[in-house]
């Protein structure tokens, strides 16, 4: 009994000692981060300078962008958002300084590496363009870029049009029983369309979402996996939580994501076995793999197929949902767009890319939607190089994380007049006088520099075709339950969106 008491006293003493050490360490880190840290000259809330907890809390709640907007409104162009992370909204200078090509004043500087917290290698161990180092990224981009050139997109248009026609016909079918009127969830319909398009371009066959009018199981896995990214981020910044990882991460979801990559690899092999020359991604990737010394391994092709499937679908669908909502909340803009589209095309069959590419108001509407509701709304962190770097006139020491907070930059009056108004006219060439001082280069929704989005041409093509055919075919009205749709969207690195209930009425000609 005495031995037990002695051991109990020892255990209590050790536990108490550990608690005291933890409190002392926490106190030391708090004083250091607030008073002596190398980022102490960067403005921001005191609590953000000493702890990751506030930032992690917003990450878990899905309120990062709202918080970023508030911080920049209060503290200015540059804000310390965590003990080792700094956010910028001075996009005109910060984008080139952080993400740009190393030319001109930056000649001789290395590209800043990505914040490794956000870029975890696929389960097969082979990095895609997203995680690759500079050398491997350049090698992979030389191979993959052929699938996204303007010439390639022009050849892919008939395939894209096939699925857009399925979308329009499906919506007509969904409203047929009510004399051409009905209410649908456009978030689901846009997701089905963009995922079917990207799957056919990648694998030679769609997911079948538009055919089945349901979300394929691996599309559902992808959409759910966005929510787990925030948890991985928090676990990375609080290492002691990794011992409780199973309590925070749904291991079934982790396994499903591994199964998804395995399924993608199988689909890639099936597509390669067909040996067809249709103008899809795989034809162009395989035709150029090995040219000029740039060659991807089979596993790298699989990893990049997984990336393209994800990046080339959900973000496009997000923008389509957003622009639909914004048009319906801004009747003046909708009427002007409707007039341009319906006067330009006498028939549905005439709606083709060569003509769509000349339509200035359609283009301005999409640019304004990308500014107002960027599909990737957060900052993509980069690690400052050895010796430190000047970013937008501020010196940042090596090892700290820097980024441009996209949503906050695009909704700042420092960059745009009436930033919370949906005004496509700000993108007109020549500029509208009222918006002549807008810093349009502060908006880079497809990112910037050597790591800029590879699929920009395809995204613009899909957006133009889908939006034009929707506006030509239907009159749209926002249902009461979706009047606050945008405010109910949350950011889990990408947007997590609720139902967008829209009443459609087929246009009779």
Swiss-Prot record:
Name of the gene this protein is made from: traB
EC number(s) recorded for this UniProt protein: 1.-.-.-
Biological-process GO terms, alphabetical: mycotoxin biosynthetic process
Protein name: Cytochrome P450 monooxygenase traB
Organism from which the protein derives: Penicillium crustosum (Blue mold fungus)
Topology of this chain in the membrane: Single-pass membrane protein
Cofactor(s) listed in the protein's UniProt record: heme
Function (record text): Cytochrome P450 monooxygenase; part of the tra gene cluster that produces terrestric acid. The clavatol biosynthesis cluster cla and the terrestric acid cluster tra are both involved in the production of peniphenones and penilactones. The non-reducing PKS claF is responsible for the formation of clavatol from successive condensations of 3 malonyl-CoA units, presumably with a simple acetyl-CoA starter unit, and 2 methylation steps. The esterase claE probably collaborates with claF by catalyzing the hydrolysis of ACP-bound acyl intermediates to free the ACP from stalled intermediates.
Keywords, ordered alphabetically: Heme, Iron, Membrane, Metal-binding, Monooxygenase, Oxidoreductase, Transmembrane, Transmembrane helix
One of the record's GO molecular function terms: oxidoreductase activity, acting on paired donors, with incorporation or reduction of molecular oxygen
Keyword Ubl conjugation belongs to the record: no
GO cellular component: membrane
Database matches in Gene3D superfamilies: Cytochrome P450
Pathway linked to the protein: Secondary metabolite biosynthesis
Residues reported in the UniProt entry to bind heme: 453
Annotated knockout phenotype: Completely abolishes the production of peniphenone D, penilactone D, penilactone A and penilactone B, as well as of crustosic acid and terrestric acid.
Annotated TM spans: 8-28
Subcellular location as annotated: Membrane
Family statement drawn from the similarity comment of this UniProt entry: Belongs to the cytochrome P450 family.
